[in-house]
Regions:
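Structured cytosolic domains appended to multi-pass membrane proteins
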Residues: 458-554
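Transmembrane helical cores of multi-pass ion-transport proteins
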Residues: 1-453, 514, 546
Length: 554
């Protein structure tokens, strides 16, 4: 592969999306971008705080990482930034390795992601079974919810452990510091987020709920109708954040806020900082690097596929998307950011708000910059319990809880992989869950494929025994040739073996080795090994090894 020819294929979707771009499309993208930017701001702060970082780490990750992913990515509408899936991983890395090493592992993961896209390996991410993805997603959702109980309850806990069981112990030990004001704010936020969309649930023909529509007709209030429509488009997290922050400020409620814990949010871009790279450090961080890269790749490409389904726009380019994710994660750590990836909630909001191109993603970043510059001083009043309520809502929406109810209808393999990955994620960590889950998936796949290989004896005389082979003869199925070897060992001298292989679709090195051993056993007893109906792939394998010349074929 020559680098110049490959660079010719480096085509961000932004380049093709703006071809024939119109003013009408710009206004749609701008409106969608503003909406997504408003939604993204509280989420970015909440994800950073939940990860054990300062809120500005999430904000600048959303701005810088989001801009790079939109500008260079392979999806027209995907929105990038900090994601809930990374909360548990980042918190564990910071606790175990420290903040500086988080930045290094994120940058290294960016390099790995870029290389995956560069060598066109984006399709490999689809080989991760959906049962594993569902299991670790639900596990992460549980861990996010558990990690937010401290702030939801207003407990005075100096530092929360990343260990599942230790978190329960810490919460129990500090239960006496419960702050009822914080709990009330958090529960109000959570309840409001569930109720808000129900107030404006649209009716297909009218766009308003039947009850609201009747009320509008009764009072014939055009202005009220417009106000309701505008309210229905306002994101629930923003309504909860603004309302409850104002309530806390004016009533002077004694709860912990961003200001009391972090001292406020800087209004300037963080300075460029070069982490202390060394090969020894990089080697130490191999596991977190691979975890960040794998989760980022899976999360972003799943998100891009969802965007394709709901937007009706041309399909995303997975390799271009991975390269964009790589660039974003290589750059963001130098500004003190956290891992960035595609985010489903913000991407769906973008599509439903009318976004049609990466311009919407860039506008979402511009919106966040404007809001930060204008309103950063006000963020000091945001109660942490309200952010905890928002994250609990995110965790609820993140999980696929209905899958537990349908497990009895699923296959044993699906149940084993999903539940195994789920419990390993919760009890241990995502790295262990992914490693064990993928190994278990491979073992189950080999077992399933081995059952598809069949050996059937069709005839036997003192001179010749005939067998028909079906399926794929690979390392997981070679034991099924043992009955043929048993026949050879107990047969009279000079018996030949005929293998009808017209239904044998593939042959690997292990299968070839067993056939060679079988051939030697037959020849030692004065017989012949005959193949009838060899297909192209098995014939090619046998020919390259020289085995084909040693046997008879029909």
């Amino acid at each position: 592969m020559h680098l110049p020819s490959y660079l010719a294929t480096f085509k961000p979707r932004l380049i093709t999306a703006v071809a024939g771009y119109t003013k009408e499309r710009f206004f749609k993208d701008a409106g969608a971008g503003i909406t997504v930017g408003i939604v993204a701001l509280p989420l970015a702060m909440a994800f950073a705080i939940a990860s054990g970082l300062k809120p500005e780490a999430g904000i600048w990750t959303a701005i810088i990482g989001g801009a790079l992913i939109s500008a260079l990515g392979g999806s027209a509408v995907q929105i990038g930034g900090p994601a809930g899936a990374f909360v548990v991983i980042v918190y564990a890395i910071v606790e175990r390795y420290g903040l500086a090493n988080l930045l290094i592992s994120t940058a290294c993961a960016g390099v790995l992601l870029f290389l995956l896209g560069f060598f066109k390996l984006g399709a490999l991410v689809r080989y991760v079974p959906v049962s594993i993805v569902t299991g670790f997603t639900n596990g992460i959702a549980v861990l996010i919810a558990l990690s937010q109980l401290k702030d939801l309850l207003g407990l005075k806990v100096p530092k929360m452990s990343a260990d599942f069981f230790s978190q329960f112990k810490v919460i129990a030990e500090h239960a006496g510091t419960l702050n009822l004001y914080a709990l009330g704010l958090g529960l109000s936020c959570l309840l409001g987020l569930f109720i808000w969309p129900l107030l404006f649930r649209v009716r297909e023909a009218r766009g308003l709920s039947t009850r609201l529509h009747k009320m509008m007709r009764a009072v014939e209030g055009v202005q009220l109708l417009s106000a309701v429509k505008m309210a229905s488009r306002t994101p629930g997290p923003i309504v909860a954040l603004v309302t409850l922050t104002a309530l806390t400020f004016f009533l002077e409620l004694p709860v912990e806020t961003i200001g009391t814990r972090f001292g406020g949010i800087p209004q300037a871009l963080p300075p460029f900082t070069l982490p202390d790279f060394s090969w020894e450090t990089v080697r130490l961080l191999v596991t977190p690097t691979i975890t960040i890269a794998l989760l980022g790749a899976v999360e972003s490409l799943l998100c891009a596929r969802v965007a394709d389904q709901i937007s009706g726009l041309p399909r995303h380019d997975p390799n271009q998307e991975l390269m964009a994710q790589g660039v974003a994660n290589m750059v963001v750590p130098f500004f003190g950011g956290m891992p960035a990836t595609g985010t489903i909630a913000r991407t769906v909001t973008n599509v439903r708000s009318g976004g049609t191109s990466p311009v919407a993603g860039l506008m979402h970043c511009v919106t966040m910059v404007v809001v930060v510059l204008a309103a950063a001083p006000l963020a000091v009043h945001v109660p942490l319990s309200v952010l905890a309520g928002i994250l609990l809502f995110v965790a609820w929406n993140m999980g696929e809880w209905r899958v537990f109810a349908s497990l009895r209808r699923a296959s044993n393999h699906y149940r084993l992989l999903m539940l195994g990955t789920f419990f390993l994620t919760v009890v241990f960590d995502l790295t262990v869950a992914l490693q064990v889950g993928l190994i278990l998936a491979c073992v189950l796949f080999v077992r399933r494929m081995s059952t598809l290989f069949q050996v059937v004896e069709t005839s036997r005389t003192p001179q010749q025994a005939s067998f028909t082979l079906y399926g794929a003869l690979f390392f997981g199925a070679v034991a099924k040739l043992d009955p043929i070897l048993t026949v050879v060992e107990s047969a009279p001298q000079g018996m030949s073996i005929r293998l009808d292989v017209q239904s044998l679709q593939s042959l690997d090195a292990s299968g070839l080795d067993v056939l060679e051993q079988l051939h030697k056993a037959i020849v030692m007893r004065g017989g012949r090994l005959i193949f009838a109906g060899l297909n192209a792939q098995p014939r090619s394998v046998m020919e390259r090894s020289g085995f084909l010349a040693q046997v008879e074929t029909l």
